[in-house]
From Swiss-Prot:
Superkingdom of the organism of origin: Bacteria
Protein name (record): tRNA-specific 2-thiouridylase MnmA
Record-linked NCBIfam families: PRK00143.1, trmU
BP GO terms, sorted: tRNA wobble position uridine thiolation
Localization per Swiss-Prot or TrEMBL: Cytoplasm
Alphabetized UniProt keyword annotations: ATP-binding, Cytoplasm, Disulfide bond, Nucleotide-binding, RNA-binding, Transferase, tRNA processing, tRNA-binding
EC number(s) on file: 2.8.1.13
Disulfide bonds listed in the record: 100-196
HAMAP family: tRNA_thiouridyl_MnmA
GO annotations of cellular component type: cytoplasm
Active site (UniProt): 100, 196
Pfam families linked: tRNA_Me_trans, tRNA_Me_trans_C, tRNA_Me_trans_M
Residues holding ATP: 9-16, 35, 124
Length: 384
């Protein structure tokens, strides 16, 4: 009887390497697939693609599996990077890793794996898949400190039915331990951080290559001008560092935070104090929705939600919202407690305990700024 073939997405990191080894040990016919999703700067100081491929080949040789590389750079630019630039141009703060998982790692990659006669795919993500009553559920990882279900919330039933997450049941410390025990050449390689196509380079420098700077006024909620920004795209809601107002002589002495963007007037609004009303929200509206089960929760459903990665689940109630301009579905979340710096463009992801239900892209978060005359909510960036 032939072995079941599993194609493993291998990045050169320790997680995907241990994933491949575990599946090989379990008797699967394992094939490694290295995805190249970015073409520019292959020889630049911030690009690790070449070394990552060397690490993948070394690991494959050690554990005895075949490996190949596939170039998804064109698909990535069309499906992920173009949207990334559109969102930043509109003043929002997108999360490209969420879209990359849905469009590249679990779509383009999955399709390619099936062309290699694979039955399943596997990655080194920290999450779990469970089949129950004929449906597939996306669950948080056993190690909640490494859980990545937030980034995977847009996966659908077809994708989950073909996906394995072998690391979902173990802590990261165990993964490192296995890597050392079997002598993986990348056992001590540090975890990747930041957006995949930016790597370790300064984010503002990277963004400046693709989006023009457009300086404008920086004002307080009462309309007082306190400085000048370099372009709304280069700031995000709740940002503290890099504003350039550290010791403003007219301030209260508390740190400054980005609180809103007014696109028509090209104005950046800033406030002082971590708990300023403009930074706190009890409700949000999200669009571009995606549900793991294929349908939304019931109206009024009590659940938990994350509005950023590694945030603790915040108690809230789900509600249906008026459809968007093109008739697209939207939803609201009403939080029990005020949430800090809920950022348009980021994902609001819903949970029922350990089960990830899905979510959507935050369009607007109601806060103290909505009642302020200096920056009417209708003109703020989150209004689409």
């Amino acid at each position: 009887m032939s072995k079941r073939r599993v194609v493993v997405g291998m990045s050169g990191g320790v997680d995907s390497s241990v994933t491949a080894w575990l599946l090989k040990e379990q008797g699967y016919d394992v094939v490694g697939l290295f995805m190249k999703n970015w073409e520019d700067d292959d020889d630049g100081e911030y690009c690790s693609t070449r070394q990552d491929w060397i690490d993948v080949v070394s690991v494959a040789d050690l554990i005895g599996i075949d490996v190949e590389a596939v170039n998804f750079a064109a698909e990535y630019k069309d499906r992920v990077f173009a949207e990334f630039l559109r969102e930043y141009s509109a003043g929002r703060t997108p999360n490209p890793d969420v879209l990359c998982n849905a469009e590249i790692k679990f779509k383009a990659f999955l399709d390619h794996a099936m062309s290699l006669d694979a039955e399943m795919i596997a990655t080194g993500h920290y999450a779990r898949v469970r089949e129950r009553d004929g449906r597939f559920e996306l669950l948080k990882a056993f190690d909640h400190t490494k859980d990545q279900s937030y980034f995977l919330h847009r996966l659908n039933q077809a994708q989950l039915s073909k996906t394995m997450f072998p690391l979902g049941e173990m802590p990261k410390t165990k993964v490192r331990e296995i890597a050392a025990q079997i002598g993986l050449p990348n056992a001590k390689k540090k975890d990747s951080t930041g957006i995949c196509f930016i790597g370790e380079r300064p984010f503002r420098d990277f963004l400046n290559r693709y989006l023009p700077t457009k300086p404008g006024p920086m004002k307080t909620p009462d309309g007082k001008r306190v400085g000048e920004h370099i372009g709304l795209a280069f700031y995000t809601f709740g940002q503290r560092k890099g504003i350039g107002l550290g010791g403003s002589k007219d301030g209260s002495g508390e740190p400054w935070f980005v609180a809103a963007k007014d696109i028509p007037s090209n104005t950046l609004y800033v406030v002082q104090g971590h708990d300023h009303p403009w930074l706190l929200s009890h409700e949000l509206v999200a669009g571009n929705v995606s549900w793991v089960a294929g349908e939304p929760p019931a109206d009024g459903f009590a659940c938990g939600a994350k509005t950023r990665y590694r945030q603790a689940d915040a108690a809230c109630r789900f509600g249906a919202a008026a459809a968007g301009p093109a008739g697209e579905a939207r939803f609201t979340l009403a939080f029990d407690d005020a949430q800090w710096a809920v950022t348009p463009g980021q994902s609001a992801v819903l949970y029922d305990g350990e089960i990830c239900l899905g979510g959507g892209i935050i369009e607007h978060a109601a806060s103290g700024r909505d009642a302020a005359a200096a920056a009417p909510a209708a003109a703020l960036v989150e209004a689409r």
